[in-house]
Amino acid sequence: MPLIGDKFPEMEVQTTHGLMKLPAEFKGRWFILFSHPADFTPVCTTEFVAFQEVYPELRELDCELVGLSVDQVFSHIKWIEWIEENLDTEIEFPVIADTGRVADTLGLIHPARPTNTVRAVFVVDPEGIIRAILYYPQELGRNIPEIVRMIRAFRVIDAEGVAAPANWPDNQLIGDHVIVPPASDIETARKRKEEYECYDWWLCHRSASGD
């Protein structure tokens, strides 16, 4: 089972948009792969609508979105049609029709419920490296804005060599500022308070360059 910091496993998958090779299909871009337990289930349906709502925003962030469950492709297609006809939402992102091989590779099958994929999220960067993995129980839907926030934060983190505080960009202490990495030597530590806003030399912050 891959972990944070590992390369996303290479695989060819059948999707509602045809065959795809991952992660090569999205080389040079971020992508989010999310698994759902099953088609035609209530929580998953609300999640698909919510993911579609933010899909244009994700694409503006150069990030793609891919769904997955252990269902046949015709089930995915029929469910997507139902969502469009009944909920007035066209699902534009591809959904992987998995036979179980992909789910096994990614560790998405829980022994207690071997016929359904767990509710998981993999965030993969433009180099094909897994940057975050999230798991949710079947009875709890995902917080979709948090997933978008992660993409926004990772882009700033990578571009500027900084860290993002809790609840960024609405942190209780430093607002939309980002955290400067702590000094690694005495001389730099002494200069930190002159260069940045700081609570102490090891907790300094600044505005993001894009601000």
From Swiss-Prot:
Documented EC number(s): 1.11.1.24
Subcellular location(s) of the protein: Cytoplasm
GO cellular component labels: cytosol
GO BP annotation list: cell redox homeostasis; cellular response to stress; hydrogen peroxide catabolic process; response to oxidative stress
Active site: C44
Cystine pairs: C198-C204
Additional remark text: The active site is a conserved redox-active cysteine residue, the peroxidatic cysteine (C(P)), which makes the nucleophilic attack on the peroxide substrate. The peroxide oxidizes the C(P)-SH to cysteine sulfenic acid (C(P)-SOH), which then reacts with another cysteine residue, the resolving cysteine (C(R)), to form a disulfide bridge. The disulfide is subsequently reduced by an appropriate electron donor to complete the catalytic cycle.
Function: Thiol-specific peroxidase that catalyzes the reduction of hydrogen peroxide and organic hydroperoxides to water and alcohols, respectively. Plays a role in cell protection against oxidative stress by detoxifying peroxides.
Protein's UniProt name: Peroxiredoxin
